[in-house]
Structures are given as C-alpha cells and as structure tokens.
C-alpha cells in the first residue's frame, strides 16, 4: 500500500474513533430526552430502560472517517454504501421509536439492495471457482444478491441480543475482511473496514463496560452495520474486483466469507427454520438464539459475547487450516459448512440435550459460566469508571 493511502486509512480510523468517543454522551442525552429507550419485557435481557441510539453515534463516526480519508484517497466507490447505510439507519431508528411492520422493513431492504445492484453494480456475480463456477448470469445474480444482502442485514440485526455481541462481531469481521482487502490492496474497502472498527470500538466499550454510559446500538445501528457487512461480502466475491487475484493463490473467497459470517448466518438460518417447523412466522421473536442459550446456562453478557465470537473464530480457523493445508476451493467450502453447522446448530442441540438431562457436562459449563460474572472485580470497576468518566 502506498504511503498516502496508508496515511489516509490511519487518519480515517483515528477520526472515526475520536468522533464517536466525543458524540456518544451527547447522543445518549438526546435518546433520554426524547425517550428513545429499550424497555424491559419478557424477551429482553436488561432490567431497566436503556437508550437505543448507539447506531446514530456510530454513523457520525463513519461519515467523519470517510470525510477525513477523502484528501488522501478516492472514496467515491463507498458513497453508494453510505447512502444505503443512511436509509437503513433511518428505518431502524423509526422502528426503535414507533415500531414498524417486519414486512415493511423487509420491503425497504429489498429496494435498497436493488438500488445497490443497479446503481452501484454491487452484486454477487461470481462464485470465484467454487464447483468450477466463475461468472454468474444476471438472471441468477440479481435474486442471489437480494437474498444474500437482505439475509445478512437481518442476521446482524438478529444477533443484537446481548451487550457487545453485534458490535463485537462487526469489529471481528472488519478485521478479517480488512486482512483480505489489505492482501489485495483494495484501498477503498480497507478504509471502510478501518472506519467501522474505529467507530464501533468506543461504542463497544460503553455498551459492554459502561453503567451510566451504556447505550444499545438499536435496530438503526444493527441494520446499518448489516449493510456494511454485506458490502464486505459483495466486494470479496464479485467479478472485476481486487479480490479476483485471490483465486490464483488458492484462497476460496466464498468459503472465507461464509466462515467470517458463520454465526450470524448459520444461527439465523437455524432459528428461522425451527420457527417455520413450529408453524410460526420466521420473523416472530423468541429466545432460541445461541446467545440466549449461553445466558440460560448462567453466562454473563460479556461471557456470552466472548463465547459466541469464539465459536465464529473457530470456524474461521478451520477454513484457514484447510487453506494452509492446500485444500481445493470446494474442500474449503465443505470444511466451512461442516464446521459451521457443528459449532452453531450442533452445539445448540448438544447443550439442549445436556440441559434436558442435567448432565455433568452441563454442570461444568454452568460453573465456567458463573466465572464470567466479573462485575465485582477491581479491573472491571476500573474499566467502568473509565468509560463512564467518573
């Protein structure tokens, strides 16, 4: 990467981090003043109302980060993504404030995706060698892109159930995709990864460690970050991009993206499939996600987030091992599919059996979960005071 490009990435990261660190408290005051809060109910895991405009603070960081990078490099390829993020942020905030029909949200997501396809040429038009397939015809590419982008947006939204999970996942995914984009010198995509990490880190600290400064990212933030995650996926596998050269290196781009997206995608598919089997709407909320399972087994929010993210990292490591061992792109895909199912649906089913039978394994897991409650530890208190500015 050229020096000016690298400088632009660093400036964008610092600017996005600093802006969110500054505006977080102000956005929180707005949320409290206008009663934009998430109230406890039978399905929620918090015990008191929590401000829910964290996505707005993150959006400020993303916008300022892009502006800060503009003197150093061309950010025009990211403007369609920014527009899509803005629309989904507005829709999500409206949902947080007054509640929207899931079908209306679904329709908006489809429209936004189609605009990205036709106006910004963002489509899944290449399998990058999976099963020997490269270019995908438009009649297949368009519906495939709609399903993938809308699915990813909703998957990120659905994992937003415990402190730090959706933001922590997006930070992890941004690092993973950022490494890929750095390898192929895709500068605009690297900037998007950098400002995503920079904007999410301050929010993550407040969301996880804060007490008086705790704020949820909300539907606005999770839908917005779903657009970012889907743009990573499209940039990784679409034709004509910098990542095309990865196929020559033996890197399975479809397996890689699926590995990074493992927990949101596989867990969402499992949950929706089970809802359909129970003859309920796939969009009907319940408490059957992986993070609900860890909470039920006695883990803290922080412990739950770390465990769920660890499961995702394990799948990425399985993919990396298969690549390093020289596996073909097809074999890499099968490794990701098998490990993804095992570490999500398989793990969920295994622990459900342990809970039903009250086994020794369950008692050990519960004992481990109890150790994740560290709110009384000095280091936790120090972090809490630091983020609350006490």
Regions found by a protein language model. Give the residues of each.
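Alpha-helical transmembrane segments
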Residues: 2-30, 35, 59-87, 166-297, ...
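Juxtamembrane helix-capping/reentrant segments at transmembrane boundaries
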Residues: 39-53, 214
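Short aromatic-rich membrane-water interface segments that cap or initiate transmembrane helices
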Residues: 45-51, 131-142, 250-257
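A generic, lipid-embedded transmembrane alpha helix
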Residues: 51-67, 114-119
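Transmembrane alpha-helix boundary signature
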Residues: 64-76, 94-100, 117-131, 237-243
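Membrane-embedded alpha-helical core segments of multi-pass
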Residues: 86-91, 108-123, 144-154, 170-176, ...
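Membrane-interfacial loop-to-helix junctions in multi-pass inner-membrane proteins
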Residues: 98-108, 140
């Amino acid at each position: 990467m050229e020096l000016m490009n690298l400088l632009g990435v660093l400036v964008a990261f610092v600017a996005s981090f600093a802006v969110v660190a500054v505006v977080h408290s102000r956005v929180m005051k707005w949320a409290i003043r206008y009663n934009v809060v998430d109230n406890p109910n039978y399905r929620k895991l918090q015990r008191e109302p929590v401000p829910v405009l964290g996505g707005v603070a993150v959006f400020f960081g993303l916008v300022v980060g892009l502006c800060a990078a503009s003197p150093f490099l061309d950010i025009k390829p990211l403007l369609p993504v920014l527009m899509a993020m803005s629309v989904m942020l507005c829709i999500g905030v409206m949902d947080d404030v007054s509640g929207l029909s899931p079908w209306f949200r679904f329709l908006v997501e489809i429209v936004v995706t189609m605009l990205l396809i036709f106006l910004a040429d963002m489509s899944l038009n290449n399998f990058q060698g999976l099963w020997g397939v490269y270019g995908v015809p438009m009649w297949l590419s368009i519906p495939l892109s709609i399903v993938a982008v809308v699915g990813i947006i909703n998957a990120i939204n659905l994992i937003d159930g415990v402190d730090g999970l959706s933001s922590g996942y997006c930070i992890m995914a941004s690092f993973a995709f950022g490494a890929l984009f750095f390898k192929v010198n895709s500068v605009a995509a690297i900037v998007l990864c950098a400002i995503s990490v920079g904007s999410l880190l301050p929010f993550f600290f407040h969301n996880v460690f804060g007490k008086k400064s705790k704020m949820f990212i909300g539907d606005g933030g999770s839908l917005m970050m779903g657009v970012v995650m889907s743009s990573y996926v499209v940039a990784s596998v679409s034709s004509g991009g910098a990542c095309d050269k990865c196929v020559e290196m033996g890197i399975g781009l479809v397996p890689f993206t699926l590995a990074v997206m493992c927990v949101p995608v596989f867990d969402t598919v499992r949950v929706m499939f089970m809802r359909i089997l129970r003859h309920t709407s796939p969009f009907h909320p319940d408490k059957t996600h992986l993070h609900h399972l860890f909470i039920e087994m006695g883990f803290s929010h922080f412990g739950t987030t770390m465990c769920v993210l660890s499961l995702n990292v394990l799948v990425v490591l399985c993919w990396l091992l298969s690549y390093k061992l020289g596996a073909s792109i097809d074999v890499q895909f099968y490794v990701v599919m098998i490990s993804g199912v095992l570490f999500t649906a398989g793990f969920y089913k295994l622990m459900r059996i342990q809970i039903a039978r009250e086994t020794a394994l369950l008692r050990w897991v519960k004992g481990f979960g109890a150790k994740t409650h560290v709110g009384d530890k000095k280091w936790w208190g120090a972090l809490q005071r630091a983020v609350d500015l006490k």
